[in-house]
């Protein structure tokens, strides 16, 4: 039987085995999906052993996305633009393709599930880490009017924006760009995406409420049983809509499943089941 797995550290909390098991049942695919905890330096050996057997694909979570990027024999355009791999695919000739489905998972959630518009909109992205790098190609393909990436280290945001400058109006800056007191513009945005992990620790990124209006749609890549701290903050300052990252998680998993099996699962019942189980 074809086997798949997700690797990371930590990994016990991963919902990927549950998600892919539901996808397999829904689409009547025969497969096994497990999780494996790896220590730093163990990725290459584990992947080689897995693919030498019945292994057909691996999902990769932190901190091994760079290891997977280096392990792949070939990289997709999405993986190249992200600089990271979250999905490995064993092809018919035995070679390994590296893919990144994080960005398409997020964009599909925003445009298809939430029905928010990105085209022609002003978009603020908070953070400039690996999670943000993975979403910029599909985001820029939506033709937003303007994208501003803000990060504690301004140079990191600037470097990230520069990689996608040929695709449209995108720039990077420090958090001070949003503060009138520090000479910034302090303007409002149509869509705000939190790509930091601050909500996991109950914290907030240092951005002013003035970025939100009563038409702003606010997305936190983090998810949980309750609205995240970033969502609550946005709601308290009058945002029109807020969402957490569960749809992104299920969406990137659905894209991985499609790349592996050639069938697109319906994510709606899986989303509903995960919400009920939280």
UniProtKB/Swiss-Prot annotation:
Residues at the catalytic site: 65
Binding residues annotated for shikimate, in chain numbering: 14-16, 61, 86, 102, 223
Entry keywords, A to Z: Amino-acid biosynthesis, Aromatic amino acid biosynthesis, NADP, Oxidoreductase
One Pfam match: Shikimate_DH
Top enzyme class: oxidoreductase
GO molecular function: NADP binding; shikimate 3-dehydrogenase (NADP+) activity
Superkingdom of the organism of origin: Bacteria
Annotated NADP(+) binding sites: 127-131, 151-156, 221, 245
Pathway: Metabolic intermediate biosynthesis; chorismate biosynthesis; chorismate from D-erythrose 4-phosphate and phosphoenolpyruvate: step 4/7
GO biological process terms, semicolon-separated: amino acid biosynthetic process; aromatic amino acid family biosynthetic process; chorismate biosynthetic process; shikimate metabolic process
EC numbers on record: 1.1.1.25
InterPro entries noted in UniProt: Aminoacid_DH-like_N_sf, NAD(P)-bd_dom_sf, SDH_C, Shikimate_DH, Shikimate_DH-bd_N, Shikimate_DH_fam, Shikm_DH/Glu-tRNA_Rdtase
Record-level GO cellular component terms: cytosol
Recorded catalytic activity of this chain's protein: shikimate + NADP(+) = 3-dehydroshikimate + NADPH + H(+)
PANTHER family associated with the record: BIFUNCTIONAL 3-DEHYDROQUINATE DEHYDRATASE_SHIKIMATE DEHYDROGENASE, CHLOROPLASTIC (PTHR21089:SF1), SHIKIMATE DEHYDROGENASE (PTHR21089)
Quaternary structure, from the entry: Homodimer.
Protein family membership: Belongs to the shikimate dehydrogenase family.
Cited function: Involved in the biosynthesis of the chorismate, which leads to the biosynthesis of aromatic amino acids. Catalyzes the reversible NADPH linked reduction of 3-dehydroshikimate (DHSA) to yield shikimate (SA).
Protein name (Swiss-Prot/TrEMBL): Shikimate dehydrogenase (NADP(+))
Lineage start: Bacteria, Pseudomonadati, Pseudomonadota, Gammaproteobacteria, Cellvibrionales
Gene (name only): aroE
């Amino acid at each position: 039987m074809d086997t798949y797995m997700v690797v990371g550290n930590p990994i016990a909390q991963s919902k990927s085995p549950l998600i892919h098991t539901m996808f397999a049942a829904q689409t009547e695919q025969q497969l096994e999906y497990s999780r494996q905890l790896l220590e730093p330096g163990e990725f290459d050996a584990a992947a080689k052993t897995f693919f030498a057997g019945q292994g057909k694909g691996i999902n990769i979570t932190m901190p091994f996305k760079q290891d997977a990027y280096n392990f792949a024999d070939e990289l997709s355009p999405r993986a190249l633009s992200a600089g990271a791999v979250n999905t490995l695919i064993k092809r018919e000739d035995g070679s390994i393709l590296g893919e990144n489905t994080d960005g398409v998972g997020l964009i599909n959630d925003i445009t298809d599930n939430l029905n928010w518009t990105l085209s022609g909109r002003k978009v603020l992205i908070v953070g400039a880490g690996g999670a943000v790098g993975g979403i910029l190609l599909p985001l820029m393909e939506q033709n937003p009017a303007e994208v501003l990436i803000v990060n504690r280290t301004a140079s990191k945001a600037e470097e990230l924006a520069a990689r996608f400058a040929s695709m449209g109006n995108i720039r990077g800056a420090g958090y001070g760009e949003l503060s009138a007191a520090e000479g910034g513009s302090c303007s409002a945005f149509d869509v705000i995406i939190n790509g930091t992990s601050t909500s996991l620790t109950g914290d907030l990124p240092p951005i002013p409420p003035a970025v939100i209006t009563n038409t702003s749609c606010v997305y936190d890549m983090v998810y949980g049983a309750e609205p995240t701290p970033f969502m609550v903050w946005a709601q308290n300052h009058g945002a029109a809509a807020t969402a957490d990252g569960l749809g992104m998680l299920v969406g990137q998993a659905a894209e991985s499943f499609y790349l592996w099996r050639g069938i697109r699962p319906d994510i709606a019942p899986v989303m509903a089941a995960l919400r009920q189980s939280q």
